[in-house]
Amino acid sequence: MLRLHLNLCVKVWISGFSLLTFSIYGIFAHAADIKPFADIHVHFNWDQKEIISAQQIVAKIKKQNVAITVVSGTPSALALELHAADPKRIIPFFSPYITAASRKNWYLDKNVLLQAEQGLATKQYAGIGELHLWAGMPPRTDNPVFQGLLDLAEKYHVPFLIHTEAADQRFFLPICQSRPQIRFLWAHAGGTLAADQVKPVLKQCNNVWVELSARDPWRYNTLVDDNNNLLPGWLALCNEYPDRVMTGTDPVWSVRKGQRWDAADDGWDHFEQLLEFHRSWLAQLPPNVEEKIRFSNAKRFLFAEN
């Protein structure tokens, strides 16, 4: 069978953002022809399930040869629903948002710890997260529910996907330093932080890995320049810490607005676009570094066999 591969560069205007260059990668290629990808950060939330099913999501990731996918759900159990649709590819993490309304008050609900322990003890979940902490907003880092989740990560030896929003790395540093036994996956590498702010965390906390989801031009926009070239600081960081960087799509729209009650989240409609963005900047790295960040780092981090 004839297989047509395209690797063209086009310039496009997208949603009012600046002119960007993208590669159209393998539009007509079969999934087996595309390099395997580990998407370390996706969601299956109640406001996504309204417009896309678990089976439709699995079809999307298979088509793009995403071999490993870490999912958290709101409510938490939706991660298990997506996992059930493809247990080989989907790795569920326990989200502290156990109901559709838990995002704002999870840290006041002791049921979070009960459900987390039950899910980890029975090996339903392979990790904890995504959990959000905002500097200057509740909860404080000494909150009993937050600390209890950290205790469970230590007890069951599972990774912890943590999202922090702060002006610099000093908000997260005490957390990773106080829990050296926990393997932290730092969501979005701190979001708005520059590479030179992220590097001290990697240097001082060898239990931290970073993932670069949502650092695309439509959300945090802090990874590449207007021509889609990887910024020098990130290029240097990836080359200096090639074993501790991963990436993912985080198909939530928009990542900074949170969930809405008046409209469904169509983030999965952007999945292919987000994935292509990450493949494009990864292609700028040395081949051995590209392969680690694209796939094998996640495989080792999660103890996945395939």
Question: Language-model segments: which ranges?
Answer:
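H/E-rich (His + Asp/Glu) clusters that bind or coordinate divalent metals
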Residues: 183, 191-306
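Active-site gating/metal-coordination segments in enzymes
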Residues: 32, 78-161, 214-217, 223-224
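Hydrophobic faces of well-ordered beta-strands that scaffold small-molecule active sites
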Residues: 38-42, 69-71, 92-95, 128-129, ...
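Bacterial N-terminal signal peptides
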Residues: 11-26
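Acidic (Asp/Glu)-rich catalytic clusters
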Residues: 58-62, 79-91, 114-124, 151-154, ...
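An N-terminally biased module of ancient metal coordination in phosphate/nucleic-acid-related enzymes
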Residues: 26-88
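Acidic/histidine-rich helix-loop elements
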Residues: 42-53, 101-107, 136, 219-223, ...
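N-terminal secretory signal peptides that target proteins for export/translocation
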Residues: 1-10
